[in-house]
Amino acid sequence: MAGGTRAFTAVLTRPDGQSGALASQLAEAGCDVLEFPLIDIAPVDDPAPLDAAFAALADYALVIFVSPNAIDRALAQYGAIWPNALPVGVVGPGSVAALERHGIAAPAHRVIAPQAPAD
């Protein structure tokens, strides 16, 4: 907004380094933007519980991931090809894209995701 007062300030609380595109779009739309990360994405302190869960994947009917960050961290630790017979549930299109980056996508895998964007 050249020469004018900005309408409002948007506070972006996404993890550090993950709000750049949104910040740019908001600034172009005339908003002041304050990036204020409230979540720090880091490796788990004790990988044993996740390793145990991965070792038991054959016992599960479904695995659900709650975010692209969860997918990236978990699958980096898993380090193997995801079993084709094990469906994966996710909450939004960003998570679907994260699964695809890790080679988990239809038709080889069943990915369960809502049709409407997550709130």
Regions inferred by a protein language model and the residue ranges of each:
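Conserved beta-alpha
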Residues: 1-119
